Amino acid sequence: MLDKLTHLKQLEAESIHIIREVAAEFDNPVMLYSIGKDSAVMLHLARKAFFPGKLPFPVLHVDTRWKFQEMYRFREKMVSEMGLELITHINPDGVAQDMNPFTYGSAKHTDVMKTEGLKQALDKYGFDAAFGGARRDEEKSRAKERVYSFRDSKHRWDPKNQRPELWNVYNGKVKKGESIRVFPLSNWTELDIWQYIYLEQIPIVPLYFAAEREVVELNGTLVMIDDERILNYLTPEQKASIHKKMVRFRTLGCYPLTGAVESTAATLPDIIQEMLLTKTSERQGRVIDHDAAGSMEEKKRQGYF
């Protein structure tokens, strides 16, 4: 079966070409590392692109302080094993406000801790190109985004002010203060990602595999009880409804804003089989994508990845 998956090798070659092109063309690139499955694949491709040498750029994690604990443990493990140059940035303004998704809501929390945090980090270190693991099949606004996504000096995305991309030729020319967000996985699908992870045996966060976990239903979303902080924001009725269920995650982010899905897929072949049958987008589990109509495009216009 796997030896016939030639399209994966074509996608791999395209992504490696893009990564090498950016490393050669830009003065100070960085790779965003969100610790999820797409980041894992992108990082694997980057290591392949420059093997046996080390990555010629650092990896950046914009931390919100509300990621799953397993994600933090996995991040430290990967950094140690791969010898990565990791930069972690937390928005100090958000820390001062004790920003959290319960008191301030998902939109405000995401804007302050993710969007503003990312812009702060890019400005602080002067990065002129930033790799991201977004794919066109994820969401409508991402479907119309270029591989080289031009951002102005305020990090804003204007869908009408983008460069044509003919064949595999990309225009990375920017003025001082402007930058490019680069998406090497643009043409991959969620199924491609899982098949490639299986083919290459890429390590991923265990949360992607089904297991019995403590969850509570909040506004129709199964939220995992990842640490004690969440208990401070639950009503007595919600606390009483906490129960264990076989679930896994198709996408990972801040745990109060990431919905689990009921599943028994505990191995990579199980997940691939599940992906072949599913009819819903993985981002349906992201609360931030449902803030308002067109919310993702508006976030991207303001500087979100």
UniProtKB/Swiss-Prot annotation:
The keyword Coiled coil does not apply. Gene3D superfamilies: HUPs. GO terms for biological process: hydrogen sulfide biosynthetic process; sulfate assimilation. Pathway: Sulfur metabolism; hydrogen sulfide biosynthesis; sulfite from sulfate: step 1/3. It catalyses: sulfate + ATP + H(+) = adenosine 5'-phosphosulfate + diphosphate. GO terms for molecular function: ATP binding; sulfate adenylyltransferase (ATP) activity. SUPFAM superfamilies: Adenine nucleotide alpha hydrolases-like. Its EC number is 2.7.7.4. Heterodimer composed of CysD, the smaller subunit, and CysN. With CysN forms the ATP sulfurylase (ATPS) that catalyzes the adenylation of sulfate producing adenosine 5'-phosphosulfate (APS) and diphosphate, the first enzymatic step in sulfur assimilation pathway. APS synthesis involves the formation of a high-energy phosphoric-sulfuric acid anhydride bond driven by GTP hydrolysis by CysN coupled to ATP hydrolysis by CysD. HAMAP family: Sulf_adenylyltr_sub2 (MF_00064). PANTHER family: SULFATE ADENYLYLTRANSFERASE SUBUNIT 2. Belongs to the PAPS reductase family. CysD subfamily. This is Sulfate adenylyltransferase subunit 2. It comes from Ectopseudomonas mendocina (strain ymp) (Pseudomonas mendocina). The gene is cysD.
